[in-house]
């Protein structure tokens, strides 16, 4: 018989689902009813910081600041010698080469530049380096290209290391080349390249650049007929497309078109949360075709006839995220836009009732999601819990929480909204703490937006903090009626005004 301390433990499944556990042995009632693997595990008490750790960390930060000042000093000395003709070469010299994933990169040569001999070599070396970084860091959570096919397309380029400042200059030039070449191309590779750039801008918090590229991807998707591939709409490809850009001659090409379409729709749905000026997204029909399983997509050769395609709604982590963003979040978008269109006051009894029903619907989906993740863990490989639902709950309800003093509140605060937003923030914080440092370094930039939304809510409702009217931050930061993307330009302006020259240059 287990000791008294262990008899009080809830099983892992009930902990993850946030439900009461009857602590039955060897299986609790929930696990026995649903056929889950019931496991009891003692909670691990994380040790605190070791003695002297904070002082060591402060010393490392000081050393890093000194090194940064040295780098910025060398940068300021070398900036005048940067050839001004290199940027002009992009506009005056025709590019050669072909469009290659994941970046549409062509060499730019100029006989007038004093570095004409080294620039193509550096550009090519940086191109292959960026491609390898993509395959190692981005491909696992942004699976829009077949991994094996992309690996075969990337050659190993052995070249000496490029200085960081030179690499930054070339990287910016490559971004411009991708956008310029995309303006004159209508192909799946163009969509993949723009998606790559858009997620980079997303991670940097450059929402204007992201939304512009997302609009281009949306239009290209329509012109290439990608909604037809996904079974969402009978949109015919544009007659401006060449025939080879439309036809899918292989299963890999067909799957890449499918994944590109769903990635566009998924990012569009996440970004549009809480933005009144953004057009509402439409829910995907039940008969839509979703991406294949992770096992099939990771095969080392072309898909065979025996590989099952698009069997289940929860066949992969990508499919589950698509289901959340395009099906479950669609009612949230429609609800927010209906309030704007009708001019109804948010916070009334009818509004609260409708918002609570949406919250309950998301909670039910989360329970199904947890069960699906357990099935995927047993069948294929583990998947990280999706964080996109957290900003959906926060965005839906944060405007009705207790706003800080100094921020005008049109309606009385709703206790239910306070409780649910705080629970969503705590749940997300618990998931982030369980992630390893290596996972955080290569996680999706889409995770940055939920983290910032939760951190902003924590700061706004904190009891012990600087009053909002006395804070150096813009008052809109504490006004939770604004979405995160709506205040980013104000925060960037605040950073430019108040940050030190060192931080502004980083």
UniProtKB/Swiss-Prot annotation:
Listed Polar residues bias regions: 75-84
CDD domains, alphabetized: fungal_TF_MHR, GAL4
Keywords: DNA-binding, Metal-binding, Nucleus, Transcription, Transcription regulation, Zinc
Gene Ontology cellular component list: nucleus
Applied use: Notoamides have been shown to exhibit antitumoral activities. Notoamides A-C show moderate cytotoxicity against HeLa and L1210 cells with IC(50) values in the range of 22-52 mg/ml, but the IC(50) value of notoamide D is greater than 100 mg/ml. Moreover, notoamide C induces G2/M-cell cycle arrest at a concentration of 6.3 mg/ml.
Domain of life: Eukaryota
Residue ranges of DNA binding: 11-38
Keyword Transmembrane helix annotated: no
Transmembrane annotation, as ranges: none
A Pfam entry, by short name: Zn_clus
GO molecular function, one term: DNA binding
Compartment(s) where it occurs, according to its Swiss-Prot or TrEMBL record: Nucleus
Ranges for region Disordered: 73-102
Matches recorded under InterPro entries: TF_fung, Zn2-C6_fun-type_DNA-bd_sf, Zn2Cys6_DnaBD
Physiological role: Transcription factor that probably regulates the expression of the gene cluster that mediates the biosynthesis of notoamide, a fungal indole alkaloid that belongs to a family of natural products containing a characteristic bicyclo[2.2.2]diazaoctane core.
Stated name of the protein: Notoamide biosynthesis cluster transcriptional coactivator notQ'
Organism of origin: Aspergillus versicolor
Gene name of the encoded protein: notQ'
